[in-house]
């Protein structure tokens, strides 16, 4: 995966205060940065008053310039003391030159009264790379979405309205590239009639730009030595509203439990329906699953999703608190087993990723990390590892707002007014405001989603017991398959890939394929474990014909084909949506990496909240993309990015 040019902030320290060498300016007031933040951004967006009386279930702040995170921490502190306990704060901040972890820690140490908040931020402020990253605090009540890159490139990729804007960053005279007409126009595009803004600057170019974009602008007293500042509100557009209600999620694997969890976190009462007597019985039922990103040399959607999902899953697992018996960050070595793979790995390693995310290691270093002799160098992911899928699913489904209906197969869905009725045979099982279909290939069994081109792929894993006295593998090894480190006295390796095969009996020939992979990846380990008869498990995974998941709202495909829409200025309004019906499926063998972030995408879209990824990626995952392309309507492939009617 190719990433944009990326560099961390170049800081100087003047009398203990951070100073930007690039912009030639300070990050905050030398006299009282805290009071300046509270005066400019909190007070002049009327946040305390708005939060004390807010009716919606979430509030979104968008900031230009994260800097030291001071504005975020002050907003979080005020939120905790003024907002109702059941609502959420989304703080979206765009930063071109993020501080290193060490510099951020040093800067935030200047504000001891914020220590509890800065400590929580620093605990998650790792592996910060270009693009979208979501950090979650207070059991989901506070969410920070960091957008690393150029503000004018990233701002159009937002997927929700802002309730308040923090126009920070450096002064227009120091940072003219940011303070452009495009900034103000994009602000207008993502504002509603109650959206406010505040900024420390009173420059004429800013005042005129905001007014031209539709903002009512006031010049008021600044803070300290700053005589004037600007604040105001947007004058157009109504804010869409969405309240949590009742949801049914179909499917008890990683996609279904993650979807249930993200909705439950937002106050939904969720009925999680699974046809088996327990969760995680099919593709999510393997004893061990691996968690790592599969990156490409170039910026392709699958690589972008893989990286975003990997980082999201690492943070989610940390929040869930799975113990060492269920999850371990043992590190992963992606072996450069031939010349093509060597070039791919080294190209990725040279793209500027932080070393704590990935870096190249030579053959000797790889062997030292693994604990066994290896024949190849590798791309090393220090935080990658393994997880027990069943424990993961149980933790996700353990939310107090989730009830489980097990050993029950959903056979049909029907609309009844503004609700969805969920049927098992002739019996009405439930009635809900929204339904999320997350039952793998069985999603295509419903009339409403039978147009989804899902494919089934058999995969078999093999387990080999450790031999006493032999070297122990400590890290995850990957090529086209994987070998786990030693877990419960055995190694897990796999998985085979057999498209179109839906049988689940264990086969000797597929054990042989896995053993051949082991022999090629780690011959020294193979020699110590053979001869030995492996045990194993086979399951059927679900993928799409283009190997990208299907995530988003569902169209009425029959009506679409009967009456294709004409071109309109608003493509979302021209499509026959099935309001309240969503799908999260087709994750294939990468479900542990991609399904949780897909669930977060769905929940955010339902609530008009900022997405954890850019709008281009949301569009790529549109579950209706195949039928739209078939009808020559490729321009309407938008999915979650186009804000269809939610109910």
From Swiss-Prot:
Cofactor (UniProt): FAD
One Gene Ontology term of the molecular function aspect: flavin adenine dinucleotide binding
Location (main, coarse): cytoplasm
Catalytic activity, as annotated: 5-aminomethyl-2-thiouridine(34) in tRNA + S-adenosyl-L-methionine = 5-methylaminomethyl-2-thiouridine(34) in tRNA + S-adenosyl-L-homocysteine + H(+)
Tagged with keyword Signal: no
Region (FAD-dependent cmnm(5)s(2)U34 oxidoreductase): 250-647
Any one Pfam family match given in the protein's UniProt record, by short name: Methyltransf_30
EC code: 2.1.1.61, 1.5.-.-
Function description: Catalyzes the last two steps in the biosynthesis of 5-methylaminomethyl-2-thiouridine (mnm(5)s(2)U) at the wobble position (U34) in tRNA. Catalyzes the FAD-dependent demodification of cmnm(5)s(2)U34 to nm(5)s(2)U34, followed by the transfer of a methyl group from S-adenosyl-L-methionine to nm(5)s(2)U34, to form mnm(5)s(2)U34.
Region described as tRNA (mnm(5)s(2)U34)-methyltransferase: spans on this chain: 1-235
Subcellular location: Cytoplasm
Keyword annotations of the record: Cytoplasm, FAD, Flavoprotein, Methyltransferase, Multifunctional enzyme, Oxidoreductase, S-adenosyl-L-methionine, Transferase, tRNA processing
Domain of life: Bacteria
Gene Ontology BP term (one): tRNA wobble uridine modification
Designated name of the protein: tRNA 5-methylaminomethyl-2-thiouridine biosynthesis bifunctional protein MnmC
Gene Ontology cellular component terms for the protein in this record: cytoplasm
Native organism: Methylobacillus flagellatus (strain ATCC 51484 / DSM 6875 / VKM B-1610 / KT)
Family membership noted in the UniProt record: In the N-terminal section; belongs to the methyltransferase superfamily. tRNA (mnm(5)s(2)U34)-methyltransferase family.
